[in-house]
A protein has these predicted regions:
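A late-sequence structural motif
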Residues: 376-417
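Short helix-boundary/capping micro-motifs
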Residues: 33-47, 133-145
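Secondary-structure junction motif
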Residues: 298-299, 312-333, 399-409, 417
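Short beta-strand-centered segments that line the small-molecule binding cleft or hinge
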Residues: 2, 121, 206, 251-288, ...
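Central regulatory/effector-binding core of bacterial HTH transcription factors
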Residues: 136, 141-151, 155, 212-270
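A short LG(V/I)-centered, amphipathic sequence patch enriched
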Residues: 61-78, 161-178
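Hydrophobic hinge/microswitch elements
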Residues: 249, 258-262, 268, 326-376
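Interdomain hinge and pocket-entrance segments immediately C-terminal to HTH DNA-binding domains
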Residues: 103-126, 206-223, 238-241, 287
Length: 417
């Protein structure tokens, strides 16, 4: 197993750099052939000659490691391997068609300016260019990331802008700003590339090789024990898999989730998620406790009062986080002076063990510190501090077997404190 960790800003998957992705028109041909049962009819529908269609199927079969179509009688039928690829292709077509419908509404017409559908003009070069321009913020940085010349990246990006018929960029060559339409297409490009990655990974799984990728976004509560325990269990089952564990702000991780840069986000759930393309699943309820370093003056008390807490110094998460909001509701911080704000467990541990500061935190986050006797829980019940912990995914996410097994490992890793 290869384990990667970092922050959400470095979540760019190298898959788009490493793979020779299939031709999107060839995938449309495969999907149409399975749907109508005839390669000739499918070729006419995607405007490919019969000889070219036959060559396209040979090339696709080579790319995906085996036959995708078989001829029986007068028709063609998809193999099991072929259906894996077709399933992902249909998800790609749904994404592209949904985007095209949005474009049509903005243009108040039923087709993009150049008179053809985005579906028929879209290429992998367009996807890569827009995906990486969106991430890097400039044509030059995107070109370096892709290992291409800057003019070729610019050409692909400007070409898709013309096909769509909406302005995708503002600003100059050195630093480009994506318009809302540009952001939307960059997200589409990233998700389509993700589906292509998943098609390859599922075919590999079909062949018994579980060497795919799983990228996990983590919020504070999940980073210490829940996700690590699940990752260890998963790596024992799939030693060839690459697993990335990323942290970052909630907003940054949500954006990475929406664009397919991470597969699942684990941590405290928000009451109402503002992103329509995402969904939450509750796994368990967690409670907060008041914690100090070993030997704190309040640690030997059998009972604490709110006055004791009000007269103490605190290390707290930044304002706007769920834990800080609960602290303000349950304890109040109107008169607190000299508060230290940090989201770093390492910094928090160092401060508490060397001072008389207090903090409010989940016991699950400091499991190892409690076991080592570095910190201790103070006798003050925070009634009403329960909060749901779970996972957030894209609403239409179709996980690979590796990714689905992580969800099972995650539920197993949820042990009582």
């Amino acid at each position: 197993m290869e384990l990667q960790s970092g922050v959400s800003e470095v979540a760019d998957s190298p898959a788009a750099l490493e793979k020779a992705y299939p031709n999107l028109r060839h995938l449309r041909l495969l999907e149409a052939a399975q749907r109508c049962g005839a390669l000739t009819t499918a070729a006419e529908g995607v405007h490919i000659s019969q000889p070219a269609a036959s060559q396209a199927m040979i090339r696709l079969s080579n790319q995906f490691g085996g036959k995708l179509l078989e001829r029986h009688g007068n028709g063609v039928f998809a193999t099991d391997r072929g259906m894996i690829v077709i399933s992902r292709t249909r998800r790609i077509l749904d994404l592209v068609r949904s985007f095209s419908q949005g474009v049509s509404r903005r243009l108040r017409s039923d087709r993009p300016k150049r008179g053809g559908s985005l579906e028929s003009h879209l290429t992998v070069s367009h996807l890569k260019a827009m995906c990486f321009v969106g991430r890097a913020g400039s044509f030059s940085s995107a070109a370096r990331a892709l290992g291409q010349s800057e003019p070729s990246v610019q050409r692909a990006a400007r070409e898709i802008e013309g096909i769509i018929g909406l302005q995708l960029f503002s600003g100059g060559l050195r630093r480009v700003q994506l318009t809302q339409s540009g952001l939307d297409f960059s997200k589409l490009a990233s998700l389509v590339l993700k589906e292509l990655d998943s098609a390859y990974e599922e075919v590999r799984e079909f062949d018994g090789a579980y060497d795919g990728r799983l990228i996990i976004g983590t919020l504070p509560l999940a980073r210490t024990r829940i996700v690590p325990d699940a990752v260890v269990a998963l790596s024992q089952k799939y030693p060839e898999a690459t697993i990335g564990v990323l942290d970052g702000t909630y907003e940054g991780l949500l954006q990475s989730l929406e664009t397919g840069n991470i597969d699942v986000l684990v941590g405290a759930l928000r009451g109402k998620i503002m992103h329509s393309g995402l969904k939450q699943k509750r796994l368990f309820e967690d409670r907060l406790v008041i914690v100090s370093g070993k030997g704190h003056p309040l640690a030997g008390r059998h009972e604490l009062t709110r006055e004791d807490l009000a007269n103490s110094r605190w290390v707290l998460p930044r304002r706007g986080t769920p834990t800080r909001h609960l602290f303000e509701t349950l304890v109040g911080d109107g008169n607190l002076k000299g508060v230290i704000e940090t989201g770093s467990l390492v910094a928090l541990r160092g401060i508490l063990t060397q001072s008389n500061f207090l903090t409010i935190i989940s016991q699950r986050q400091i499991y190892y510190e409690l076991q080592a006797g570095l910190l201790e829980v103070l006798p003050f019940s925070l009634e009403g501090s329960e909060r749901p912990i779970g996972l957030t995914t894209r609403a239409d996410w179709q996980p690979t077997a590796l990714q689905a097994d992580f969800l099972s490992a995650l539920e197993t890793a949820i042990m009582p404190v």
